[in-house]
Protein backbone atom coordinates (compact mmCIF):
# COMPACT_ATOMS: atom_id res chain seq x y z
CA UNK A 1 0.00 0.00 0.00
CA UNK A 2 2.75 2.46 0.91
CA UNK A 3 4.63 1.63 -2.31
CA UNK A 4 1.43 2.30 -4.25
CA UNK A 5 1.06 5.68 -2.51
CA UNK A 6 4.67 6.57 -3.34
CA UNK A 7 4.10 5.60 -6.97
CA UNK A 8 0.92 7.66 -7.20
CA UNK A 9 2.67 10.65 -5.62
CA UNK A 10 5.21 10.49 -8.48
CA UNK A 11 2.56 10.12 -11.17
CA UNK A 12 0.48 12.97 -9.72
CA UNK A 13 3.43 15.33 -9.29
CA UNK A 14 2.18 17.65 -12.10
CA UNK A 15 -1.18 17.81 -10.32
CA UNK A 16 0.56 18.93 -7.10
CA UNK A 17 2.19 21.78 -9.02
CA UNK A 18 -1.19 22.83 -10.43
CA UNK A 19 -2.78 22.74 -6.96
CA UNK A 20 0.00 24.89 -5.49
CA UNK A 21 -0.35 27.33 -8.40
CA UNK A 22 -4.13 27.59 -7.86
CA UNK A 23 -3.61 28.11 -4.11
CA UNK A 24 -1.16 30.87 -4.99
CA UNK A 25 -3.69 32.57 -7.25
CA UNK A 26 -6.43 32.54 -4.60
CA UNK A 27 -4.13 33.82 -1.85
CA UNK A 28 -3.70 30.58 0.09
CA UNK A 29 0.06 30.46 -0.54
CA UNK A 30 2.74 33.04 0.22
CA UNK A 31 4.71 33.69 -2.98
CA UNK A 32 7.71 34.80 -0.90
CA UNK A 33 7.89 31.34 0.68
CA UNK A 34 6.58 29.10 -2.09
CA UNK A 35 9.97 27.36 -2.35
CA UNK A 36 9.38 25.79 1.08
CA UNK A 37 6.67 23.58 -0.46
CA UNK A 38 9.53 21.97 -2.39
CA UNK A 39 11.94 21.78 0.58
CA UNK A 40 14.11 24.59 -0.77
CA UNK A 41 15.58 27.21 1.52
CA UNK A 42 15.98 26.82 5.26
CA UNK A 43 17.98 24.03 6.85
CA UNK A 44 19.52 23.06 10.15
CA UNK A 45 22.93 24.55 10.81
CA UNK A 46 25.88 22.13 11.03
CA UNK A 47 27.90 23.22 14.05
CA UNK A 48 30.79 20.86 13.33
CA UNK A 49 31.27 22.42 9.93
CA UNK A 50 31.05 25.92 11.41
CA UNK A 51 33.66 24.94 14.00
CA UNK A 52 36.10 23.65 11.36
CA UNK A 53 35.58 26.75 9.22
CA UNK A 54 36.44 28.97 12.21
CA UNK A 55 39.47 26.82 13.03
CA UNK A 56 40.68 26.96 9.44
CA UNK A 57 40.31 30.73 9.36
CA UNK A 58 42.34 31.05 12.56
CA UNK A 59 45.16 28.96 11.05
CA UNK A 60 45.07 31.00 7.89
CA UNK A 61 44.50 28.06 5.55
CA UNK A 62 41.77 29.83 3.63
CA UNK A 63 43.96 32.72 2.60
CA UNK A 64 44.66 31.96 -1.06
CA UNK A 65 47.75 34.17 -1.00
CA UNK A 66 49.58 32.06 1.61
CA UNK A 67 48.05 28.59 1.31
CA UNK A 68 49.44 25.93 -0.97
CA UNK A 69 47.18 24.03 -3.33
CA UNK A 70 47.84 20.82 -1.32
CA UNK A 71 46.79 22.45 1.97
CA UNK A 72 43.68 23.94 0.42
CA UNK A 73 42.71 20.59 -1.11
CA UNK A 74 43.33 18.73 2.17
CA UNK A 75 41.33 21.31 4.12
CA UNK A 76 38.43 21.21 1.66
CA UNK A 77 38.31 17.41 1.92
CA UNK A 78 38.23 17.58 5.72
CA UNK A 79 35.41 20.13 5.72
CA UNK A 80 33.41 18.01 3.28
CA UNK A 81 33.77 14.90 5.45
CA UNK A 82 32.68 16.82 8.54
CA UNK A 83 29.69 18.22 6.70
CA UNK A 84 28.55 14.65 6.15
CA UNK A 85 29.06 13.78 9.82
CA UNK A 86 26.24 15.98 11.05
CA UNK A 87 27.10 17.31 14.51
CA UNK A 88 24.94 19.93 16.13
CA UNK A 89 25.22 22.15 19.16
CA UNK A 90 21.52 21.64 19.96
CA UNK A 91 19.00 18.83 19.65
CA UNK A 92 16.10 19.57 17.31
CA UNK A 93 12.46 18.77 18.05
CA UNK A 94 10.22 18.98 15.00
CA UNK A 95 6.55 19.82 15.70
CA UNK A 96 3.98 19.60 12.93
CA UNK A 97 0.89 21.75 13.51
CA UNK A 98 -1.60 21.88 10.65
CA UNK A 99 -3.14 25.31 11.26
CA UNK A 100 -3.92 27.99 13.84
CA UNK A 101 -5.36 25.84 16.63
CA UNK A 102 -2.54 23.31 16.51
CA UNK A 103 0.05 26.11 16.29
CA UNK A 104 -1.16 27.49 19.63
CA UNK A 105 -0.65 24.03 21.13
CA UNK A 106 2.81 23.86 19.56
CA UNK A 107 3.77 27.16 21.21
CA UNK A 108 2.64 25.82 24.59
CA UNK A 109 4.74 22.70 24.04
CA UNK A 110 7.81 24.74 23.11
CA UNK A 111 7.47 26.88 26.22
CA UNK A 112 7.22 23.85 28.52
CA UNK A 113 9.65 21.47 26.78
CA UNK A 114 12.34 24.17 26.80
CA UNK A 115 12.08 24.19 30.61
CA UNK A 116 12.69 20.43 30.70
CA UNK A 117 15.47 20.54 28.10
CA UNK A 118 17.07 24.00 27.72
CA UNK A 119 19.45 22.75 25.01
CA UNK A 120 16.64 21.84 22.61
CA UNK A 121 15.74 23.92 19.57
CA UNK A 122 12.47 23.62 17.64
CA UNK A 123 11.21 23.45 14.08
CA UNK A 124 7.49 24.06 13.55
CA UNK A 125 5.95 23.01 10.26
CA UNK A 126 2.42 23.96 9.26
CA UNK A 127 0.27 24.07 6.16
CA UNK A 128 -1.73 27.32 6.18
CA UNK A 129 -0.94 31.00 5.69
CA UNK A 130 -3.00 31.80 8.78
CA UNK A 131 -0.70 29.71 10.96
CA UNK A 132 2.37 31.42 9.49
CA UNK A 133 0.93 34.86 10.26
CA UNK A 134 0.28 33.87 13.87
CA UNK A 135 3.83 32.55 14.22
CA UNK A 136 5.33 35.68 12.68
CA UNK A 137 4.51 37.53 15.91
CA UNK A 138 4.60 34.72 18.49
CA UNK A 139 7.49 32.44 17.49
CA UNK A 140 10.23 32.34 20.17
CA UNK A 141 13.90 32.73 19.24
CA UNK A 142 14.60 29.05 19.91
CA UNK A 143 12.18 28.02 17.14
CA UNK A 144 11.96 28.23 13.35
CA UNK A 145 8.90 27.94 11.15
CA UNK A 146 8.73 26.32 7.73
CA UNK A 147 5.79 25.33 5.58
CA UNK A 148 5.47 21.57 5.27
CA UNK A 149 6.62 20.40 1.83
CA UNK A 150 4.33 18.57 -0.58
CA UNK A 151 3.83 14.96 0.53
CA UNK A 152 6.07 13.48 -2.14
CA UNK A 153 9.15 11.36 -1.41
CA UNK A 154 11.47 13.70 -3.35
CA UNK A 155 10.57 16.77 -1.32
CA UNK A 156 10.06 14.92 1.96
CA UNK A 157 13.50 13.31 1.86
CA UNK A 158 15.14 16.62 0.96
CA UNK A 159 13.32 18.32 3.84
CA UNK A 160 14.44 15.64 6.30
CA UNK A 161 18.05 15.72 5.06
CA UNK A 162 18.05 19.49 5.52
CA UNK A 163 16.75 19.38 9.09
CA UNK A 164 17.85 16.01 10.55
CA UNK A 165 15.30 16.14 13.45
CA UNK A 166 15.97 14.26 16.70
CA UNK A 167 12.27 13.91 17.62
CA UNK A 168 9.05 14.54 15.72
CA UNK A 169 5.70 15.48 17.28
CA UNK A 170 2.53 15.52 15.16
CA UNK A 171 -0.49 17.32 16.65
CA UNK A 172 -4.07 16.12 16.06
CA UNK A 173 -5.22 14.73 12.74
CA UNK A 174 -2.95 15.52 9.77
CA UNK A 175 -1.56 12.20 8.56
CA UNK A 176 0.72 12.72 5.57
CA UNK A 177 1.78 9.15 4.66
CA UNK A 178 5.08 9.95 2.96
CA UNK A 179 6.17 12.55 5.52
CA UNK A 180 5.40 10.22 8.42
CA UNK A 181 6.91 7.10 6.83
CA UNK A 182 10.14 8.89 5.87
CA UNK A 183 10.28 10.87 9.12
CA UNK A 184 10.30 7.68 11.18
CA UNK A 185 13.58 6.71 9.45
CA UNK A 186 15.24 9.80 10.95
CA UNK A 187 13.82 9.96 14.46
CA UNK A 188 11.11 8.73 16.81
CA UNK A 189 7.69 10.20 16.07
CA UNK A 190 4.87 10.97 18.52
CA UNK A 191 1.22 11.55 17.61
CA UNK A 192 -0.41 13.66 20.31
CA UNK A 193 -3.90 15.03 20.92
CA UNK A 194 -4.95 12.72 18.09
CA UNK A 195 -8.51 12.76 16.85
CA UNK A 196 -10.47 11.25 13.98
CA UNK A 197 -13.59 12.96 12.68
CA UNK A 198 -16.61 10.79 11.92
CA UNK A 199 -16.13 11.42 8.19
CA UNK A 200 -12.45 10.40 8.31
CA UNK A 201 -13.27 7.37 10.45
CA UNK A 202 -15.67 6.03 7.82
CA UNK A 203 -13.05 6.58 5.12
CA UNK A 204 -10.26 4.90 7.12
CA UNK A 205 -12.47 1.87 7.83
CA UNK A 206 -12.33 1.15 4.10
CA UNK A 207 -8.53 1.53 4.13
CA UNK A 208 -7.76 0.04 7.53
CA UNK A 209 -4.51 -1.64 6.44
CA UNK A 210 -3.14 1.63 5.01
CA UNK A 211 -4.08 3.47 8.22
CA UNK A 212 -2.18 0.89 10.26
CA UNK A 213 0.88 1.22 7.99
CA UNK A 214 0.95 4.97 8.66
CA UNK A 215 0.27 4.79 12.39
CA UNK A 216 2.87 2.08 13.08
CA UNK A 217 5.53 4.73 12.43
CA UNK A 218 4.63 6.48 15.69
CA UNK A 219 6.43 5.42 18.87
CA UNK A 220 3.56 6.79 20.99
CA UNK A 221 -0.04 7.71 20.22
CA UNK A 222 -2.01 9.91 22.62
CA UNK A 223 -5.63 10.66 21.77
CA UNK A 224 -7.74 13.51 23.08
CA UNK A 225 -10.93 11.67 24.07
CA UNK A 226 -12.44 8.29 24.89
CA UNK A 227 -14.43 8.48 21.66
CA UNK A 228 -11.21 8.87 19.64
CA UNK A 229 -9.60 6.00 21.54
CA UNK A 230 -12.50 3.76 20.51
CA UNK A 231 -12.04 4.79 16.87
CA UNK A 232 -8.31 4.01 16.95
CA UNK A 233 -9.06 0.63 18.53
CA UNK A 234 -11.66 -0.11 15.86
CA UNK A 235 -9.02 0.63 13.22
CA UNK A 236 -6.69 -1.93 14.76
CA UNK A 237 -4.52 0.37 16.88
CA UNK A 238 -4.47 -1.15 20.36
CA UNK A 239 -1.60 0.77 21.99
CA UNK A 240 -3.09 4.30 21.87
CA UNK A 241 -3.79 6.05 25.17
CA UNK A 242 -6.21 8.81 26.19
CA UNK A 243 -4.89 11.75 28.24
CA UNK A 244 -7.58 14.27 27.32
CA UNK A 245 -7.37 17.37 25.13
CA UNK A 246 -4.04 19.20 25.40
CA UNK A 247 -5.78 22.43 24.32
CA UNK A 248 -6.64 22.77 28.01
CA UNK A 249 -2.91 23.37 28.50
CA UNK A 250 -2.70 26.21 25.98
CA UNK A 251 -1.60 29.38 27.68
CA UNK A 252 -3.91 32.35 27.94
CA UNK A 253 -3.67 34.48 24.80
CA UNK A 254 -1.23 37.36 25.17
CA UNK A 255 -2.67 40.85 25.43
CA UNK A 256 -0.91 44.16 24.86
CA UNK A 257 -1.77 46.02 28.06
CA UNK A 258 -1.31 49.47 26.52
CA UNK A 259 -3.74 48.61 23.72
CA UNK A 260 -6.15 47.10 26.24
CA UNK A 261 -6.19 50.25 28.38
CA UNK A 262 -6.94 52.40 25.32
CA UNK A 263 -9.68 50.03 24.18
CA UNK A 264 -11.38 49.94 27.60
CA UNK A 265 -11.43 53.75 27.79
CA UNK A 266 -12.65 54.02 24.21
CA UNK A 267 -15.55 51.57 24.71
CA UNK A 268 -16.78 53.66 27.64
CA UNK A 269 -18.54 50.89 29.64
CA UNK A 270 -20.33 49.37 26.66
CA UNK A 271 -21.15 45.67 26.88
CA UNK A 272 -19.18 43.86 24.20
CA UNK A 273 -20.30 40.83 22.21
CA UNK A 274 -17.55 39.05 20.29
CA UNK A 275 -18.27 36.70 17.41
CA UNK A 276 -14.95 34.90 17.03
CA UNK A 277 -13.42 32.66 14.34
CA UNK A 278 -16.44 33.06 12.08
CA UNK A 279 -17.03 31.49 8.68
CA UNK A 280 -19.61 32.55 6.05
CA UNK A 281 -22.08 29.99 7.47
CA UNK A 282 -21.84 31.65 10.90
CA UNK A 283 -22.24 35.14 9.46
CA UNK A 284 -25.41 34.08 7.63
CA UNK A 285 -26.88 33.52 11.10
CA UNK A 286 -25.21 36.42 12.93
CA UNK A 287 -25.68 39.41 10.61
CA UNK A 288 -29.52 39.22 10.38
CA UNK A 289 -29.93 39.49 14.18
CA UNK A 290 -27.59 42.45 14.82
CA UNK A 291 -30.14 45.21 14.17
CA UNK A 292 -32.58 43.54 16.56
CA UNK A 293 -29.92 43.37 19.29
CA UNK A 294 -28.87 46.99 18.78
CA UNK A 295 -32.48 48.17 19.05
CA UNK A 296 -33.02 46.31 22.34
CA UNK A 297 -29.64 47.02 23.95
CA UNK A 298 -28.20 50.41 23.04
CA UNK A 299 -25.20 49.87 25.36
CA UNK A 300 -24.19 46.76 23.40
CA UNK A 301 -21.28 46.82 20.93
CA UNK A 302 -20.52 44.01 18.47
CA UNK A 303 -17.10 42.84 17.32
CA UNK A 304 -16.69 40.26 14.55
CA UNK A 305 -13.40 38.35 14.19
CA UNK A 306 -13.43 36.23 11.01
CA UNK A 307 -11.42 33.02 10.91
CA UNK A 308 -9.93 34.16 7.60
CA UNK A 309 -9.35 37.94 7.61
CA UNK A 310 -8.71 37.98 3.86
CA UNK A 311 -12.51 37.72 3.45
CA UNK A 312 -12.91 41.28 4.74
CA UNK A 313 -14.32 42.72 1.49
CA UNK A 314 -17.03 40.08 1.15
CA UNK A 315 -17.95 40.47 4.84
CA UNK A 316 -18.36 44.24 4.50
CA UNK A 317 -20.47 43.72 1.37
CA UNK A 318 -22.69 41.28 3.28
CA UNK A 319 -23.04 43.84 6.07
CA UNK A 320 -24.32 46.38 3.54
CA UNK A 321 -26.88 43.86 2.28
CA UNK A 322 -28.19 43.65 5.87
CA UNK A 323 -28.14 47.47 6.22
CA UNK A 324 -25.30 47.34 8.75
CA UNK A 325 -22.51 49.88 9.03
CA UNK A 326 -19.15 48.23 9.60
CA UNK A 327 -15.53 49.28 9.98
CA UNK A 328 -12.45 47.10 9.59
CA UNK A 329 -9.53 47.23 12.02
CA UNK A 330 -7.21 47.78 9.06
CA UNK A 331 -9.05 51.09 8.51
CA UNK A 332 -9.44 52.16 12.16
CA UNK A 333 -7.29 50.84 14.97
CA UNK A 334 -10.13 51.52 17.43
CA UNK A 335 -13.82 50.69 16.93
CA UNK A 336 -16.07 53.35 15.39
CA UNK A 337 -18.72 53.41 18.09
CA UNK A 338 -21.58 54.82 16.03
CA UNK A 339 -21.25 51.94 13.56
CA UNK A 340 -23.12 48.68 13.99
CA UNK A 341 -20.07 46.45 14.24
CA UNK A 342 -16.29 46.36 14.12
CA UNK A 343 -14.50 43.71 12.04
CA UNK A 344 -11.05 42.59 13.19
CA UNK A 345 -9.19 41.72 9.99
CA UNK A 346 -5.84 41.23 11.73
CA UNK A 347 -4.21 38.14 13.20
CA UNK A 348 -2.95 37.81 16.75
CA UNK A 349 -5.34 40.10 18.64
CA UNK A 350 -8.08 37.70 19.68
CA UNK A 351 -7.00 37.97 23.33
CA UNK A 352 -7.37 41.75 23.26
CA UNK A 353 -11.04 41.52 22.31
CA UNK A 354 -11.83 38.56 24.57
CA UNK A 355 -10.48 40.79 27.38
CA UNK A 356 -13.30 43.30 26.91
CA UNK A 357 -16.03 40.82 25.96
CA UNK A 358 -18.98 39.87 28.14
CA UNK A 359 -20.27 37.17 25.78
CA UNK A 360 -18.42 35.33 23.00
CA UNK A 361 -19.91 33.23 20.25
CA UNK A 362 -17.33 30.77 18.86
CA UNK A 363 -17.62 30.27 15.12
CA UNK A 364 -17.20 27.28 12.88
CA UNK A 365 -19.93 25.69 14.95
CA UNK A 366 -22.68 25.62 12.34
CA UNK A 367 -20.83 23.54 9.76
CA UNK A 368 -17.05 23.24 10.35
CA UNK A 369 -17.06 21.23 13.59
CA UNK A 370 -16.32 24.15 15.90
CA UNK A 371 -13.18 26.00 16.95
CA UNK A 372 -11.37 26.35 20.27
CA UNK A 373 -13.85 27.47 22.94
CA UNK A 374 -11.23 27.38 25.70
CA UNK A 375 -9.47 30.56 24.58
CA UNK A 376 -12.53 32.63 25.50
CA UNK A 377 -12.98 30.69 28.75
CA UNK A 378 -9.58 31.92 29.98
CA UNK A 379 -11.00 35.45 29.80
CA UNK A 380 -14.13 34.49 31.76
CA UNK A 381 -16.45 35.09 28.82
CA UNK A 382 -19.94 33.64 28.69
CA UNK A 383 -19.53 31.21 25.79
CA UNK A 384 -22.07 30.33 23.10
CA UNK A 385 -21.58 27.93 20.22
CA UNK A 386 -23.66 26.35 17.47
CA UNK A 387 -24.92 22.80 16.86
CA UNK A 388 -21.81 21.34 15.18
CA UNK A 389 -18.94 20.78 17.64
CA UNK A 390 -17.83 17.50 16.10
CA UNK A 391 -14.14 18.50 16.19
CA UNK A 392 -14.32 19.33 19.89
CA UNK A 393 -16.99 16.92 21.12
CA UNK A 394 -15.58 16.12 24.57
CA UNK A 395 -14.70 19.73 25.41
CA UNK A 396 -18.16 20.88 24.35
CA UNK A 397 -19.81 18.12 26.38
CA UNK A 398 -17.72 18.91 29.45
CA UNK A 399 -18.25 22.66 29.38
CA UNK A 400 -22.02 22.21 28.96
CA UNK A 401 -22.16 19.74 31.86
CA UNK A 402 -20.39 22.32 34.03
CA UNK A 403 -22.97 24.98 33.17
CA UNK A 404 -20.16 27.03 31.62
CA UNK A 405 -21.49 27.50 28.07
CA UNK A 406 -24.67 27.50 25.99
CA UNK A 407 -25.27 25.59 22.76
CA UNK A 408 -27.77 27.03 20.28
CA UNK A 409 -29.47 25.46 17.25
CA UNK A 410 -30.08 28.33 14.82
CA UNK A 411 -30.34 32.10 14.38
CA UNK A 412 -33.62 32.43 16.24
CA UNK A 413 -32.19 30.44 19.14
CA UNK A 414 -29.06 32.63 19.14
CA UNK A 415 -31.12 35.83 19.25
CA UNK A 416 -33.30 34.54 22.10
CA UNK A 417 -30.24 33.39 24.08
CA UNK A 418 -28.44 36.73 23.70
CA UNK A 419 -31.60 38.67 24.54
CA UNK A 420 -32.03 36.64 27.71
CA UNK A 421 -28.39 36.98 28.81
CA UNK A 422 -28.28 40.74 28.19
CA UNK A 423 -31.51 41.34 30.10
CA UNK A 424 -30.73 43.13 33.36
CA UNK A 425 -32.89 40.64 35.28
CA UNK A 426 -30.48 37.85 34.30
CA UNK A 427 -27.26 39.55 35.43
CA UNK A 428 -26.59 36.83 38.03
CA UNK A 429 -27.13 34.08 35.44
CA UNK A 430 -24.64 35.76 33.09
CA UNK A 431 -22.12 36.16 35.92
CA UNK A 432 -22.43 32.46 36.79
CA UNK A 433 -21.74 31.35 33.22
CA UNK A 434 -18.65 33.57 33.09
CA UNK A 435 -17.26 32.30 36.39
CA UNK A 436 -17.94 28.68 35.49
CA UNK A 437 -16.14 29.02 32.15
CA UNK A 438 -12.93 30.15 33.87
CA UNK A 439 -13.20 27.43 36.54
CA UNK A 440 -13.71 24.77 33.88
CA UNK A 441 -10.52 25.58 32.00
CA UNK A 442 -8.39 26.15 35.11
CA UNK A 443 -9.45 22.87 36.74
CA UNK A 444 -8.32 20.86 33.71
CA UNK A 445 -5.21 22.77 32.68
CA UNK A 446 -2.33 21.65 34.91
CA UNK A 447 -3.28 17.97 35.19
CA UNK A 448 -3.45 17.39 31.44
CA UNK A 449 -0.27 19.37 30.68
CA UNK A 450 1.75 17.45 33.28
CA UNK A 451 0.58 14.09 31.92
CA UNK A 452 1.51 14.99 28.34
CA UNK A 453 4.92 16.32 29.37
CA UNK A 454 5.68 13.15 31.33
CA UNK A 455 5.24 11.11 28.13
CA UNK A 456 7.12 13.54 25.86
CA UNK A 457 10.00 13.76 28.35
CA UNK A 458 10.73 10.04 27.82
CA UNK A 459 11.51 10.69 24.14
CA UNK A 460 13.45 13.95 24.37
CA UNK A 461 16.95 13.72 22.83
From Swiss-Prot:
Keyword check for Transferase: yes
Organism of provenance: Rickettsia prowazekii (strain Madrid E)
Topology of this chain in the membrane: Single-pass membrane protein
Gene behind this protein: waaA
Pfam families documented for this protein: Glycos_transf_N
Enzyme class, spelled out: transferase
EC numbers: 2.4.99.12
Localization in the cell: Cell inner membrane
Gene Ontology terms: biological process: lipid A biosynthetic process; lipopolysaccharide core region biosynthetic process
Catalytic machinery residues: 102 (proton acceptor)
Protein name, per record: 3-deoxy-D-manno-octulosonic acid transferase
Reactions this protein catalyses: lipid IVA (E. coli) + CMP-3-deoxy-beta-D-manno-octulosonate = alpha-Kdo-(2->6)-lipid IVA (E. coli) + CMP + H(+)
Amino acid sequence: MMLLYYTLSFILLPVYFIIIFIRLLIGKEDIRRIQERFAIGKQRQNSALDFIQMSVNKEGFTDHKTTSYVDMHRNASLMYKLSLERSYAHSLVWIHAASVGEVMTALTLIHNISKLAPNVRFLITSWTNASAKILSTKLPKIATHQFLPIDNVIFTRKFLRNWQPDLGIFIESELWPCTINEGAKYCKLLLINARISNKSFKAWLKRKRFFQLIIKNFSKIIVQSERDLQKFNALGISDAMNLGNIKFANEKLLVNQEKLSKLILHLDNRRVLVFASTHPEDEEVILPIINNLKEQFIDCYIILIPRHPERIKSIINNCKLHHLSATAKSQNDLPVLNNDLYIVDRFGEMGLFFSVATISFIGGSFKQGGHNILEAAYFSNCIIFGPDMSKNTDIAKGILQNNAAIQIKNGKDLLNTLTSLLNANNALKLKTYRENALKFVENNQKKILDEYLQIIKQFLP
